[in-house]
Design a protein with these regions (language model features):
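His/Asp/Glu-rich metal-coordinating catalytic cores
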Residues: 1-17, 22-26, 31-206
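A short, acidic, amphipathic alpha-helical segment used as a generic capping/interface helix at domain edges
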Residues: 268-274, 325-340
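Hard-cation-handling environments
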Residues: 167-289, 293, 350
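Redox- and metal-dependent alpha/beta enzyme cores, enriched for Fe-S-associated oxidoreductases
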Residues: 279-314
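Short, solvent-exposed amphipathic alpha-helical segments in soluble enzyme
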Residues: 34, 112-114, 135-138, 162, ...
């Protein structure tokens, strides 16, 4: 079940900035409108995608949530759309969002208060992707850097290597007259994978299904946030959208690639495709999303089994995993910190406790900056 930061009290908040739509950054915000009415600031696509993901979470997950649909709409009514590099004045401080390269509309946050300047990375991808431009890191001198640490202890494979590996795997599956199932996150990852296949001039049919189709529609509304809207449009227009069960069954009548949420195989149409494709050795399953502990995707990787009709069943389709992270890896993070101007204090967040602590130690060792991993509820002075 999700863990919510319920120690955060609505009446203590002057404003809320949503960096991007992923639920670990947006999913608690509606609860702040059960008894509060703060202003929410985010880019237009972030607000649209947040609504989509939060509503889907409430519909699918049966766990406890400290809010419901009325609070989601209350959040949206109290939201102000802002663009990148648009300065917002708030009391004696100001802030602006900068492109993060992580997900459509996703931003970093640059805050100025008096003579002090703070930069929060949120989730960041300095290199960008086929879909998104690289992060905007032209931020000037700063006094405090709050950086994600998700992959601070990991060096990722070059994206080109992952793309080529995926295409090679797909061709192998097509050669044996099978179907390749690519479970992918609905926001950005599904579209990125479609672009990878289109760029490779893949000859077989590409199927897209599930909430990724709604995300496609939102992305078409905001071409200015994409690296190249023509590349995105070309990839989506050359894919086949699944609209109902009949389409779904017909799609599996010939060799093809199926891109569909959920990325970790938790619910969504992934369950349908697993039941129909996982137990035939001609088929393939390409995992291109992070697989969290306790998820069916993680179970598949570790045991080679999935739950089917109440029983654990051995998967006979070929399973491979490919790295397509939207986060900065270890080298990206060190490069970003090396290029930061000023002599900032550094806080390492958004990683497991051990990674955050080790990353802070390494930052101090490499750059001589004061760095540490803060505790929940800790007050930081700059």
């Amino acid at each position: 079940p999700p863990q919510y930061p319920e120690h955060v009290k609505p009446k203590e908040i002057d404003g809320i900035i949503i960096t991007h739509a992923h639920l670990d950054h947006s999913g608690y915000v509606p609860s702040l409108f059960v008894s509060g009415h703060s202003r929410v600031y985010a880019t237009p696509p972030t607000l649209e995608l947040s609504r989509l993901l939060i509503e889907d979470m409430l519909k699918i997950e049966k766990n406890y949530h400290p809010f419901d649909i009325p609070e989601v709409y209350n959040m949206l009514r109290n939201s102000k759309e802002i663009g990148f590099r648009e300065k917002v004045e708030k009391g004696n401080s100001s802030f602006e969002l900068r492109s993060s390269g992580h997900v459509l509309g996703g931003g970093t946050v640059l805050v100025e208060s008096g003579k002090k300047r703070l930069f929060y990375t949120g989730d960041i991808n300095p290199k960008g992707s086929r879909m998104l431009p690289e992060a905007d890191l032209d931020i000037g001198e700063i006094d405090l850097l709050i950086t994600e640490s998700t992959y601070s202890q990991t060096e990722q494979k070059p994206r080109k290597q992952s793309e080529e590996g995926l295409i090679d795997f797909a061709n192998e599956v097509m050669d044996r007259k099978g179907i390749l199932f690519v479970p992918a996150f609905s926001v950005e990852r599904s579209q990125e994978i479609a672009c990878v296949f289109r760029n490779a001039k893949f000859k077989h049919k590409i199927i897209m299904d599930g909430m990724a189709l709604k995300v496609n529609e939102i992305m078409f509304q905001y071409p200015e946030y994409l690296r190249d809207p023509k590349i995105f449009a070309d990839a989506i227009n050359h894919s086949v959208a699944i609209r109902n069960d009949r389409d779904r069954k017909n799609a599996l009548m010939e060799p093809c690639v199926v891109i569909s949420p959920a990325g970790m195989l938790v619910g969504g149409n992934a369950v349908f495709y697993l039941q129909h494709l996982a137990f035939d050795s001609k088929n393939g399953i390409a995992l291109v999303s992070y697989q969290g502990d306790g998820t069916p995707g993680k179970k598949l990787l570790e045991t080679g089994k999935v739950s089917s009709r109440g029983h654990d069943m051995k998967v006979t389709a070929e399973v491979r995993q490919f790295e397509f992270s939207g986060h900065a890896d270890r080298n990206d993070l060190f490069e970003m910190i090396k290029n930061v101007k000023g002599n900032p204090k550094v806080l390492t967040v958004h990683g497991d406790n051990e990674s955050c602590i080790r990353f802070a130690e390494e930052i101090h060792e490499r750059f001589g900056l004061e760095a540490y991993s803060p505790q929940v509820n800790e007050t930081i002075s700059v």
